[in-house]
Amino acid sequence: MSMRTEYCGLVTEHLLGQTVSLCGWVQRRRDHGGVIFIDLRDREGLVQVVCDPDRAEMFATAEGVRNEFCVQIKGLVRNRPEGTVNAGLKSGKIEVLCHELNVLNASVTPPFQLDDDNLSETTRLTHRVLDLRRPQMQHNLRLRYRVAIEARKYLDEQGFIDIETPMLTKSTPEGARDYLVPSRVNAGQFFALPQSPQLFKQLLMVANFDRYYQITKCFRDEDLRADRQPEFTQIDCETSFLGEQEIRDLFEDMIRHIFKTTIDVELDATFPVMPYSEAMARFGSDKPDLRVQLEFTELTDAMKDVDFKVFSTPANAKDGRVAALRVPKGGELSRGDIDGYTEFVRIYGAKGLAWIKVNEKAKGRDGLQSPIVKNLHDASIAAILERTGAEDGDIIFFAADRAKVVNDSLGALRLKIGHSEFGKANGLVQAGWKPLWVVDFPMFEYDDEDARYVAAHHPFTSPKDEHLEYLETDPGRCLAKAYDMVLNGWEIGGGSVRIHREEVQSKVFRALKIGAEEAQLKFGFLLDALQYGAPPHGGIAFGLDRIVTMMAGADSIRDVIAFPKTQRAQDLLTQAPSPVDERQLRELHIRLRQPEQPKA
């Protein structure tokens, strides 16, 4: 008989009366009145093994096994006795009567029980091998595998070709810092790990491969958050001779296919499309969570002449904004709740949080409860009540500051209230999946510190055709042929139509204050390629880690990556990064300089 004939979790009634050989790990060992029960686990699940004392040698071995011992058992599949069926297990109607038990490898006492749900992330990542044995982690990584498989199936059916691009490449400015790799044979020179395959996939379009994809690692040396890793995985795609709408349709279908085939979720037949300007005006975010049934109300124009300088000053500022967030039934929020929200918005730069409770709307000013009402004239109060559509029992929160602070703080408050217990109880958040496309992004953002424009996405995104003239006269007015796919408040994919003409690409570089010499030095290979009849092309990249995190309902991207880094970009399992030998540094012509100590 083979070492293993079946997976533990797949032993069911169809094997009744058969002898099987199973391999796995001891989940738990129980001694019940002279009979030993072993819950044997492998990647497919659990099966109950019964060790009877009639087989003395086998029973003696069973007495010695402990949690996480790796064992092989041979035995007879039989029905469980009446009253002992476990409906929670696929194998819960049967058990295996053990005839032979072999310890393949003993285990030291594990540092934690695999069914402990209260482990710190540090403990889990330090002992990642054991953590990966947990059923939830097994589920997450197998889900990740299925998502990748279904993406490949779809793209293959659509005529895409999987082509690998280099991991050692040229350092080019794309927003985040590069991970640099020193070259031993080219002293003093460095490769960079790719932040994306962006330029190579464009070159593949010029090279007539028409449709390209790869599921690939990308690297960015940036500050980490719950949804970021220094190395992450993209489903990276590019296609020729398709317009923006056709590209969106193609990849919208891909995401629908993946969700249906992996978790049996039917996404909307057509994803709504929202311009960037509308998303910012209504939600303060370019990745709005449409499950939350709360929206901003614009009040900037109505607050220009009020005596309340907290409102009037930003209302009259060039980059200022005053906006409101009406919360239905929010009048029941306590002062403690409001104080908590006030402290919360300070995280996002807000100086405070003004509010008005609407007790009796019909009474106008007299029906409102708020410390700020006395500072507002009747016309402004009327505008607030009319524009927000406030009703008795509502509360209205206000943000007034630079537009970015208003958008960030009030947008975060919108999500916090919507997803709170109060929000759930009052229907302020819907269940399910709410996808959309956000389009028409600004082409450039102005960097006050450097006094120049920077690319909002990357410098290879095409401006909208009608905005080409602004590249040289007013770059701030340019909108891009860029699009992000957003799902439940997460950007899961982003892409654009690319620049395919050399003269347009050069104009964009000039708008970014990248001179001809610098452009040739950094991007000469691209500019040269664009001169050889480059086709119109565009593409998109999806964050595989993010998609799987959402599907799995995981708290963090780290829960869907086998060996992730911490928020300090450290691998607690292998203790990377770590110092290297002085000889290695000499071979690379590198001398370390100690970081400067902060002054006392």
Swiss-Prot record:
<feature type="site" description="Important for tRNA non-discrimination">
    <location>
        <position position="32"/>
    </location>
</feature>
<keyword id="KW-0436">Ligase</keyword>
<dbReference type="InterPro" id="IPR004115">
    <property type="entry name" value="GAD-like_sf"/>
</dbReference>
<dbReference type="Pfam" id="PF00152">
    <property type="entry name" value="tRNA-synt_2"/>
</dbReference>
<dbReference type="InterPro" id="IPR047090">
    <property type="entry name" value="AspRS_core"/>
</dbReference>
<feature type="binding site">
    <location>
        <begin position="220"/>
        <end position="222"/>
    </location>
    <ligand>
        <name>ATP</name>
    </ligand>
</feature>
<feature type="region of interest" description="Aspartate">
    <location>
        <begin position="198"/>
        <end position="201"/>
    </location>
</feature>
<dbReference type="InterPro" id="IPR004365">
    <property type="entry name" value="NA-bd_OB_tRNA"/>
</dbReference>
<feature type="binding site">
    <location>
        <begin position="543"/>
        <end position="546"/>
    </location>
    <ligand>
        <name>ATP</name>
    </ligand>
</feature>
<protein>
    <recommendedName>
        <fullName>Aspartate--tRNA(Asp/Asn) ligase</fullName>
        <ecNumber>6.1.1.23</ecNumber>
    </recommendedName>
</protein>
<dbReference type="Pfam" id="PF01336">
    <property type="entry name" value="tRNA_anti-codon"/>
</dbReference>
<dbReference type="GO" id="GO:0003676">
    <property type="term" value="F:nucleic acid binding"/>
</dbReference>
<dbReference type="GO" id="GO:0005524">
    <property type="term" value="F:ATP binding"/>
</dbReference>
<feature type="binding site">
    <location>
        <position position="498"/>
    </location>
    <ligand>
        <name>L-aspartate</name>
    </ligand>
</feature>
<dbReference type="InterPro" id="IPR012340">
    <property type="entry name" value="NA-bd_OB-fold"/>
</dbReference>
<comment type="function">
    <text>Aspartyl-tRNA synthetase with relaxed tRNA specificity since it is able to aspartylate not only its cognate tRNA(Asp) but also tRNA(Asn). Reaction proceeds in two steps: L-aspartate is first activated by ATP to form Asp-AMP and then transferred to the acceptor end of tRNA(Asp/Asn).</text>
</comment>
<dbReference type="InterPro" id="IPR045864">
    <property type="entry name" value="aa-tRNA-synth_II/BPL/LPL"/>
</dbReference>
<dbReference type="InterPro" id="IPR047089">
    <property type="entry name" value="Asp-tRNA-ligase_1_N"/>
</dbReference>
<dbReference type="InterPro" id="IPR004364">
    <property type="entry name" value="Aa-tRNA-synt_II"/>
</dbReference>
<keyword id="KW-0067">ATP-binding</keyword>
<dbReference type="GO" id="GO:0050560">
    <property type="term" value="F:aspartate-tRNA(Asn) ligase activity"/>
</dbReference>
<dbReference type="InterPro" id="IPR006195">
    <property type="entry name" value="aa-tRNA-synth_II"/>
</dbReference>
<feature type="binding site">
    <location>
        <position position="457"/>
    </location>
    <ligand>
        <name>L-aspartate</name>
    </ligand>
</feature>
<dbReference type="GO" id="GO:0004815">
    <property type="term" value="F:aspartate-tRNA ligase activity"/>
</dbReference>
<keyword id="KW-0648">Protein biosynthesis</keyword>
<dbReference type="InterPro" id="IPR029351">
    <property type="entry name" value="GAD_dom"/>
</dbReference>
<dbReference type="InterPro" id="IPR002312">
    <property type="entry name" value="Asp/Asn-tRNA-synth_IIb"/>
</dbReference>
<dbReference type="GO" id="GO:0006422">
    <property type="term" value="P:aspartyl-tRNA aminoacylation"/>
</dbReference>
<keyword id="KW-0547">Nucleotide-binding</keyword>
<feature type="binding site">
    <location>
        <position position="491"/>
    </location>
    <ligand>
        <name>ATP</name>
    </ligand>
</feature>
<keyword id="KW-0030">Aminoacyl-tRNA synthetase</keyword>
<keyword id="KW-0963">Cytoplasm</keyword>
<feature type="site" description="Important for tRNA non-discrimination">
    <location>
        <position position="83"/>
    </location>
</feature>
<feature type="binding site">
    <location>
        <position position="174"/>
    </location>
    <ligand>
        <name>L-aspartate</name>
    </ligand>
</feature>
<comment type="similarity">
    <text>Belongs to the class-II aminoacyl-tRNA synthetase family. Type 1 subfamily.</text>
</comment>
<dbReference type="Pfam" id="PF02938">
    <property type="entry name" value="GAD"/>
</dbReference>
<dbReference type="GO" id="GO:0005737">
    <property type="term" value="C:cytoplasm"/>
</dbReference>
<dbReference type="InterPro" id="IPR004524">
    <property type="entry name" value="Asp-tRNA-ligase_1"/>
</dbReference>
<feature type="binding site">
    <location>
        <position position="220"/>
    </location>
    <ligand>
        <name>L-aspartate</name>
    </ligand>
</feature>
<feature type="binding site">
    <location>
        <position position="229"/>
    </location>
    <ligand>
        <name>ATP</name>
    </ligand>
</feature>
<comment type="subunit">
    <text>Homodimer.</text>
</comment>
